[in-house]
Amino acid sequence: TQDFQLSHSYRSTEPIVALANQVLAKDATCPIRLKSTRGKGPAATLTAYSSDEEEAKQIGKQIAELIASGITPREIAVLYRINSQSEIFEAELGALGIPVSLRGAERFFERPEVKNALLNLRAGLDVKGDRPFAETVRDILGSLGWKPKEPDSGRSARETWESLNTIVELADELQAKDASAQLPDFVKSLDLRSEMEFAPSANAITLASIHSAKGLEWEAVFVAGLSEGLLPISHANTPNEFNEERRLLYVAMTRAKTQLRLSWSKSRHTDGKGYREQSTLLRDLTF
């Protein structure tokens, strides 16, 4: 039998701690189990959404409801595995007029690789052609180092790729919604998204990668994008790396004091393309 190291959680309520313990129970190398000193609270939830956009919209709606119920924005956080996941939340929350503060990363449209991509897209506005504009976007970003497949090594290279890939996905999404859209329409839509990203505010909800949320706590925490390939990340290939992903989920869950809402989306796009599966880390969890 394994001896468990019991550690008291003064932060999270019993339902959150019980769920976090279930996650760690599958990691034989980690004997820590938490015991809550805070007592009962609302059950944690897990929701599947049809697309990334729907996930961000519905989380935005729930955040607005929490704020209306009296929770201050600074007591709310949305956590995710990789920095490029922030863009859709920046846009959706900005559209709702909810101020956001990004932790451990620049706002999406302020990232150097994104600024450079926009400059190059603008430079390509005069190029006339009959091809779908999303292909032109791929060509332009391809000249900046984007490839259809994520690079295997180097955190910096991966983060740059993820930012550029987000732009490719936004192009695909606009193309799917409006077959007649051209490159100028796409650049205009990016400018609009950029404007919707609010200036930082002291009383803002936090958007953060799980790594940059370590050691912090909020009243209400949304952990988004819990699909296979995101958490666990696609390049976690060894048992050790997989257990590291499991511990990241545990860290994300135990940032919440009272409310914990987990979610994932069944596809990347609203048209159902980019099919996803629920994270294996959520398998067999009892809510």
What are these regions (language model features)?
Residues 80, 107, 266-267:
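Conserved beta-strand edge residues that scaffold enzyme active sites
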Residues 5, 97-107, 262:
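RNase H-like polynucleotidyl transferase catalytic core
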Residues 1-2, 8-98, 124-126, 161, ...:
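Helicase P-loop NTPase motor core
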